[in-house]
Amino acid sequence: MQDGIALERKTKEELKQIAQGLEIERISVLKKDEIIEKIREKRKLLEEKKLSDAQSQQKKRERPADAVEGKGILDVMNDGFGFLRVSNYSSSRSDIYVSPVQIQRFNLKTGDEIIGDCRPIQDPDKYAPLLFVKSINGDPLEIALKRKPFEYLTPIYPTERLNLDNGGQGNAPGKLIDLLSPIGKGQRGMIVAPPKAGKTTLIKTIANSITKNHPEVKLIVLLIDERPEEVTDMKESIDGDVVFSTFDQMPENHCKISEMVLERAMRLVEQKKDVVILLDSITRLARANNLTVTPTGRTLSGGLDPDALYKPKKFFGAARNIREGGSLTILATALVETGSRMDDVIFEEFKGTGNMELKLDRTLQERRIFPAIDIIKSGTRREEAMLSNLEREAAWHIRREAAKTSNAEVMSLLLKIINKADSTRDMLDTIIKYYGKN
């Protein structure tokens, strides 16, 4: 189906060719608008027939008495068949085989979460086959058949904020991010972090705030080239999917896992769901791609191949708010001040591609000030769409004061105000009252 392509932009001759392919008769006497209407009607009938055929085929096949329910993330191979990955989006002996016929019949794609019945493994050298499809990404089968491809969805600026503040006392990181660098649904944000600046703690705080305040959002934390103990800590600290490829695994695995996570998020957005990916880190993902990409003979400063940035940029660039419904928010950490020239080049290449930036300041962390946010260098494009008048005024006063004095001085005072305030409104009033005098 050529769903998503605007028929109105086609010429009459192009529309006639499409109509002929759909076996629509007497198109020569029809006007352009009438041809478009006929094409839409025919496509709708074909979709309904495809769904009806798929459901009738499933009903014809009797459910074996020994069938068990299976669940996994689909990974479609180049040969047309696929496997449901049941553990960490990676291949294992527990995977479930999906035939090419089922993939075509139900319009299945890589990244779809499939729940269905499968036959238990008879031969230890073979995979359990999928027999019946019950749901796709938690929705009925007809929704997957009618969904628009991700590439044809209309991206727009974020308009709805992901509130990290619980509205009560404390929770300084959530309150400060909401005020200084708000995150909207569909944001493409970068957390710029030097070593030991508290980025992992900040990621956990953001993840827990999102799951608590926005239960409708699907949260995925992607850890690339991280320490195994950090993966365990993240799994135990947050309520969401933690997908990982630790530093002791091959760079090819880093790349494959990140591609699967992106496909998973895109499939959910196609079905009008809100998704948040927290990636730690985009620097290490680019490094992994640099080791796996076919050398072009050209290198940037630091030994980085220009082609190594293509897939990380595709990943980061997929973040968007969708006019038709749904959103994909990506917050990725970028490592700076590591002593590696390659890391600096990677950051420079991604600088400006996002629409939100949260810069961490190591000097604040050394003074045990958390969150160690650099007030001047952090911000969100078009933040006025997500902030109230009171919040905008408070943020303006904070930035002006940070420019006049020092980041550490302002942050220390802000943390005192936040910890003493009974509510978010009380905090904003105190900030405006205090800085308004100066």
Describe every region a protein language model picked out:
Residues P64-G70, A172-L176, V261-M266, F315:
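Phosphate-interacting basic helix/loop segments used at nucleotide- and nucleic-acid interfaces
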Residues A197-G198, I206-N438:
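P-loop NTPase catalytic core
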Residues I183-I203, D225:
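Glycine-rich phosphate-binding P-loop
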Residues D66-V68, V76-G80, Y89-S92, L108-D112, ...:
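Short flexible coil/turn linkers enriched for glycine and charged/polar residues
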Residues R26, S91-S92, Q104, D123, ...:
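Short beta-strands and strand-coil junctions in structured, solvent-facing domains, enriched
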Residues A54-A144:
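N-terminal "pre-motor" subdomain/linker immediately upstream of P-loop NTPase catalytic cores
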